[in-house]
């Protein structure tokens, strides 16, 4: 399975269809696109009502109402719906993606599924931190324990809560 997962916030919901359309128009189609929308936000007073969510005439798009985990909602909101040994690509709601994004990620994933991939990686010593805005791809098998890690370490640590690139 190939999943794409993202989240949105109140100020960006009305324009999120541009990003979703770019994901639906990929040369290699995803099996499912999750849009994870918190029922209420920790960072904003506003909420997104169901009526504000754009309709997508494609059964590949699934809206998931969930807890606000900051930008990490893009992953954690759909985590329990993912099959093992699948590719998940994390995306942002304010980017329009090149139509080859999924195809490129899948190509490299098929060569080495134990690795994570991003189109831009920040070097940090002997490590690299993938920038999620450009897309971040990982095997779902690598996500064991990430929700527990979020609950124990990230949830109450503002700097991590707001910067999912550091902990996903």
Question: Predicted segment positions?
Answer:
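Short loop->beta transition adjacent to catalytic acidic/histidine clusters or analogous donor-positioning motifs
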Residues: 2, 24-35, 59-61, 86
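Short, acidic, metal-binding catalytic loop of nucleotide-sugar glycosyltransferases
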Residues: 19-31, 39-40, 54-55
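Active-site-proximal specificity loops/subdomain of glycosyltransferases
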Residues: 36-86
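Conserved donor-nucleotide/metal-binding helix-loop-beta segment in metal-dependent transferases, i.e.
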Residues: 99-124
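Acidic donor-binding loop at a coil-to-helix junction in glycosyltransferase catalytic cores
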Residues: 160-167
């Amino acid at each position: 399975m190939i999943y794409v997962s993202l989240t949105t916030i109140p100020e960006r919901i009305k324009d999120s269809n541009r990003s979703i359309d770019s994901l639906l128009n990929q040369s290699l189609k995803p099996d499912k696109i999750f849009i994870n929308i918190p029922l209420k936000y920790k960072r904003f007073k506003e909420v997104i009502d169901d009526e504000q969510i754009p309709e997508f005439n494609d059964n590949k798009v699934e809206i998931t109402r969930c807890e606000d985990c900051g930008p990490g909602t893009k992953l954690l909101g759909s985590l329990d719906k993912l099959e093992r040994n699948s590719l998940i690509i994390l995306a942002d709601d304010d980017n329009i993606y090149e139509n080859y994004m999924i195809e490129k990620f899948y190509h490299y994933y098929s060569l080495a599924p134990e690795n994570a991939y991003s189109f831009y990686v920040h070097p940090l010593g002997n490590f690299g931190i993938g920038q999620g805005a450009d897309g971040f791809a990982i095997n779902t098998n690598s996500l064991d324990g990430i929700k527990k890690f979020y609950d124990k370490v990230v949830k109450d640590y503002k700097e991590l809560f707001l910067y999912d690139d550091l902990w996903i």
